[in-house]
């Protein structure tokens, strides 16, 4: 790690030592107290056979290793005192929150389009309270974790996310989840414009679409909006001193 590390966040002199996370395009100095692990939309809709993405024709057959890696990152974050924040994407059962024909979301959401093509699915996809909306069984929040509902691709839109972060002094966001090229990237981009430092753990994310969508999203993030790292590097960086993961 020869490159000098970028200082993430405000790096307050509070006696808490900063850690250096191996990342691209350069290492990042981060403090656990200024950092949150963000788990994006790990719901049946996005990660399970029979969920919305699967029914809409997207391949979800390789989400299993992503779930395993997210669990590993969550365990490391909790052990380091880093807040774990789960996003849960969806709308009220009447889909008022989804917007009507006057909203671009009504026209572009593949969940809404799939239900219009298949009326028998109406009320099932991404509806709060339903199986599709639920987080996958393997990634249930633990005591102390935070769950933030959201209604659009970006977790900052019309949600409590920014308030949750600012009230805790969080400046650094470490992203995992689905989909890299949609909700992960959208939230990281919005965070960039709100002065948050965004890192994606590439092996704890999965795209909606072909593999080139994953690679394009990671390229955009590394080049323009944030940093790319891995679950192993995250776990090693934030393991208790003298106790490598």
Curated annotation (Swiss-Prot):
Keywords: Hydrolase
GO molecular function: hydrolase activity, acting on carbon-nitrogen (but not peptide) bonds, in linear amides
Reactions accelerated catalytically: (Z)-3-ureidoacrylate + H2O + H(+) = (Z)-3-aminoacrylate + NH4(+) + CO2; (Z)-3-ureidoacrylate + H2O = (Z)-3-aminoacrylate + carbamate + H(+); (Z)-2-methylureidoacrylate + H2O + H(+) = (Z)-2-methylaminoacrylate + NH4(+) + CO2
InterPro entries according to UniProt: Isochorismatase-like_dom (IPR000868), Isochorismatase-like_hydrls (IPR050272), Isochorismatase-like_sf (IPR036380), RutB (IPR019916)
Cystine pairs: none
CDD domains: cysteine_hydrolases
Record: active site: 41 (proton acceptor), 150, 183 (nucleophile)
Known EC number: 3.5.1.110
GO biological process: nitrogen utilization; uracil catabolic process
Enzyme class at the top of the EC tree: hydrolase
Keyword Lipid biosynthesis tagged: no
Domain of life: Bacteria
NCBIfam families: RutB
Family: Belongs to the isochorismatase family. RutB subfamily.
Protein function: Hydrolyzes ureidoacrylate to form aminoacrylate and carbamate. The carbamate hydrolyzes spontaneously, thereby releasing one of the nitrogen atoms of the pyrimidine ring as ammonia and one of its carbon atoms as CO2.
Name assigned to this protein: Ureidoacrylate amidohydrolase RutB
Species, as recorded: Pseudomonas savastanoi pv. phaseolicola (strain 1448A / Race 6) (Pseudomonas syringae pv. phaseolicola (strain 1448A / Race 6))
